[in-house]
Amino acid sequence: MKILVVGGGGREHALAWKLAQSPKVQCVYVAPGNGGTALDSRLINLNLHLPSELSAWAATEKIALTVVGPEAPLAAGVVDEFRAKGLRIFGPTQAAAQLESSKAFSKAFMALHGIPTAEFEIFTDAVAAHAYIDKKGAPIVVKADGLAAGKGVVVAMTLAEAHAAVDDMLASNAYGVQHNTGDDGQARARVVIEEFVSGEEASFIVLCDGKNVTALATSQDHKRLQDGDQGPNTGGMGAYSPAPCVTPAIHAKAMREVILPTIKGMESDGIRYTGFLYAGLMITPDGKIKTLEFNCRLGDPETQPILMRLKTDLADVLIAGADGKLDTIELQWDRRVALGTVLAAHGYPMNPRKGDVIRGLPGGDSSVGNDAVVFHAGTARVGDETQVSGGRVLCVTALADSVKQAQARVAQVIQAIGFDGMQYRRDIGYRALK
């Protein structure tokens, strides 16, 4: 069968890489793909972007399954477009994707359905937002309402930071947020301001087929740019799986208090949820959980280590998800740890520089031995060179018997790779070593 992966980041490279391993799959198309998918003979890049273009092409080519990686096509209604043409696709509809595309919708939904989350208020007026911050004090969290490539959240440790974030989001839109439409039909800037919750974060990702839910392996992302969780927030600088902080008790609590009430709540609101659902959880020191955010897709970079550990045929899993038969699938996992470190461009996250030539990359399927893979994200083939084309450039991911050994293997692979201004963290997985 032929499969289409929509997207061009590290998550999509990992999806295509895993799907291409299935004996049932003859070809994986990636739209638009990146420099890494271009190098792999099992994968074919397509220069298609619009939902209408993608669905027309998939119908003509008799694509057996389409899976969507990034948030933007989901928010644009790519799943609705495919289903209207009777094409099999795994992902949430445009209405369901509001859980991610609108922070205001998401917080109101959680409040309505009793899903544990931080106390919050929603503002369109800067004066009222500034007054609320002064009343609540710092630390406090300011979130842009709209898609912002994972960078529209400021964890303000001081009042000055919080006030600046409100001005950036409401007045100047410094984060380039795609604004949502309000009840009056007008698109405008909104912010969600919420209490700061301390604890340990975990990425809890499940597959949903409309009625059945299957949890993926647990993982933990590292949002800050620099070692020791310093510097600005990013789309994610590395991840590892499994996450020791998600104990069996926390796992059961997350399913019971967050995931299942979300699926049931969406259904009671007239929206059937299908696709991946990612709950960003904060596990407090006293063992409670709070939902920081929902994403309607796999996390990036969490996907890379999770899929390195998955032993089950991913094509079987996603087809069962698209056909409402997830109850027939049991996921098998490699018992080893997988850890991925992101190599980012000079100037990332605010102003990444493009065009730098990347040296020392493995060719073909991007693997290094049988225990490491260099997944591409912001890369492009220009002539015979692979160049930096985005903020997060590569994710070097390895399997090993322990976090420490996985860190060492990743560091070894990174030594062979280079581009001007390359920045990365050397402490991914540090919480598991405490």
List where the protein language model places each region.
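Short acidic-hydrophobic, aromatic-tinged amphipathic segments that line or gate anion-handling sites
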Residues: 44-50, 121-125, 156
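Short, conserved charged micro-motifs
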Residues: 129, 161-164, 350-352, 401-408
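A conserved helix-loop-beta module that forms one wall/lid of the active-site cleft
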Residues: 90-152
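Active-site "cap" helix and flanking loop/linker of ATP-utilizing ligase/carboxylase catalytic domains
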Residues: 255-277, 295-363, 367-369, 382
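Generic C-terminus detector
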Residues: 50, 379-383, 387-434
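ATP-binding N-terminal substructure of ATP-dependent carboxylate-amine bond-forming enzymes
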Residues: 1-94
